Amino acid sequence: MSVDPKKLNKEVAKRRTFAIISHPDAGKTTMTEKLLLWGKAIQVVGEVKGRKTDRHATSDWMSMEQERGISITTSVMQFPYKEHMVNLLDTPGHADFSEDTYRTLTAVDSALMMVDGAKGVEERTIKLMEVCRMRDTPIISFVNKLDRQIREPLELLSEIEAVLKIKCIPVTWPIGMGQDFVGVYHLTENKTYFYEKGHGGDMTVAETREGYDYPDIRERLGALMFASFEESLELVQMALEDFDVDEFLAGEMTPVLFGTALGNFGVNMVLDTLIKYAPPPKAHPTNEREVAATETTFSGFVFKIQANMDPRHRDRIAFLRVCSGKYEKGMKLKHVRLGKDVRIADALTFLAGDREALEEAYPGDIIGLHNHGTISIGDSFTEGEELNFTGIPHFAPELFRRVILKDPLKSKALQKGLQQLSEEGATQVFMPQINNDLILGAVGVLQFEVVAHRLKEEYKVQCIFEPVSIATVRWIHCDDEVALAKFKRKAHDQLSLDGGGHLTYLAPSRVNLQLMQDRYPEVTFSNTREH
């Protein structure tokens, strides 16, 4: 399909595709909503409170998420902001969903890290940063909850640098906190932005003044606190000179902003920083070659499958990241893994569960393809070229359960449900070779609850999960057929096939795994598998 290269370059330059990473309860869902407010994508903010509130957050749209007030599914939201097009991928904040979150991070060009100002760097943030590290993802940081008592800002920066091994360069610096939160001083603009309570749900532009030394600020903070602010400001002003865009783009340095997502203060500064510094869509690796965003032929990969986004539709949607070229309604694409040509007449764009039919999409955009069971995570779509995008792995689960069906007559529905949920990446299924058991693997306990809930709600299947003595799993690979056959004979009782039919070893203990690895050096025991 002919694409005007000039128009394509312009559209690519406008795009910013990012995800928010944080520990649960650092304010990620609130931040998502406020970003949508600034992007004029929503008019009313539905703050997530308890399970009794009617107005749930726009980005939490599966019934279980709304009941529990946590984001389980990755949703996708697109909105315009100052001549740019922003694609925001909301990631599950709950500790159990690292696999889904990881796959989402393969589809973004930068990330916004949120830190709770009272708690500092938390465990989940550390894990997510490790994933960003693997991909050298540029990070913008936002220290949240300045309208409450937080830790000393300099102490927070030191902790981020020490724990996450990333250099911090403040863009804004807080003046006071909690009851005495005056606002922030913007270091590059030499302006103070004043915080006013009560504007959490609207887009009131903060009052600004040049500099920061004003009698009313001194009076509000008191002499001691103002002196402390000036002292810390001097230190961070020296750091600002070290800001290096290349180091930021390599994921080694992060611009830091302060504010309150709940109070909608500092959110537009995050968007401004994103547009100023974050990269437009980057090149993506494939097994065959690197694909640049500005290439005129279409290509993209599926990083997520979501079943039953709308119970009324009973469907499954494959989320595809556009890597190059332009999607146009009705275009013919090659589904590379199957070697089949398909006509895509009804791709979707999203505002968290609200679907709209899509006429066109550019690199960096996320589109939804209707999936009737033929699309898997990691699949590539092109205009004909044989390209297989890389870097979308399965991780070895750390928890295992045996599935026990309450009604044996429902076994067909159970298998269908588990197959679909595993294709979607909600769980991994293993079938031991010595019996007819179905073993589920997950990264965290909550995943089992989600699977049980969804099997019951969507497939009308009730099961119980019981513990099973499996410590970990490894994918098996061996080029030497004789050695592989010998290994299979010896390890028969521990072997299984995963949902994709790949041979796996279910280790009863870490010690056992180590013994098998020592005994069979020609066999590769891998803890990840590419989709």
Curated annotation (Swiss-Prot):
Give start and end of each tr-type G domain.
13-282
- Gene Ontology molecular function: GTP binding; GTPase activity; guanosine tetraphosphate binding; translation release factor activity, codon nonspecific; translation release factor activity, codon specific
* Source taxon at top rank: Bacteria
Q: Where are the transmembrane segments?
A: none
Q: Does the keyword Protein biosynthesis apply?
A: yes
- Similarity comment text for this entry: Belongs to the TRAFAC class translation factor GTPase superfamily. Classic translation factor GTPase family. PrfC subfamily.
Q: What does this protein do?
A: Increases the formation of ribosomal termination complexes and stimulates activities of RF-1 and RF-2. It binds guanine nucleotides and has strong preference for UGA stop codons. It may interact directly with the ribosome. The stimulation of RF-1 and RF-2 is significantly reduced by GTP and GDP, but not by GMP.
HAMAP family according to UniProt: Rel_fac_3
Under what name is this protein listed?
Peptide chain release factor 3
Source organism per entry reads: Psychrobacter cryohalolentis (strain ATCC BAA-1226 / DSM 17306 / VKM B-2378 / K5)
